[in-house]
């Protein structure tokens, strides 16, 4: 059986409060801190800050 890899599935949630999110993965060994990046939110039709959250 293969061992679990270093990549975790994460959810990037919009800081605009619209409830929109993107899913992606990240290498938890190389980037242990939380991700923050500007991405397009189609609900408000603007680029806003997205922050990392756990997938439920």
Swiss-Prot record:
Q: Which UniProt keywords apply?
A: Ribonucleoprotein, Ribosomal protein
Does the UniProt entry include the keyword Nucleotidyltransferase? no
Under Pfam families, the record lists: Ribosomal_L33 (PF00471)
Q: Which gene encodes it?
A: rpmG
Q: State the InterPro entries in the record.
A: Ribosomal_bL33 (IPR001705), Ribosomal_bL33_CS (IPR018264), Ribosomal_bL33_sf (IPR038584), Ribosomal_zn-bd (IPR011332)
Task: Tell me the GO BP annotations in alphabetical order.
Answer: translation
Q: Which family does it belong to?
A: Belongs to the bacterial ribosomal protein bL33 family.
- Cellular component terms (Gene Ontology): cytosolic large ribosomal subunit
* Statement: the UniProt record of this protein carries the keyword Ribosomal protein: yes
**By what name is this protein known?**
Large ribosomal subunit protein bL33
């Amino acid at each position: 059986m293969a061992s679990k890899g270093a990549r975790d599935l994460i959810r990037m949630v919009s800081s605009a409060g619209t409830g929109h999110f993107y899913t992606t993965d990240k290498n938890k060994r190389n980037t242990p801190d939380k991700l923050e990046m500007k991405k397009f939110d189609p609900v408000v039709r603007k680029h806003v800050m997205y922050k990392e959250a756990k997938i439920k």
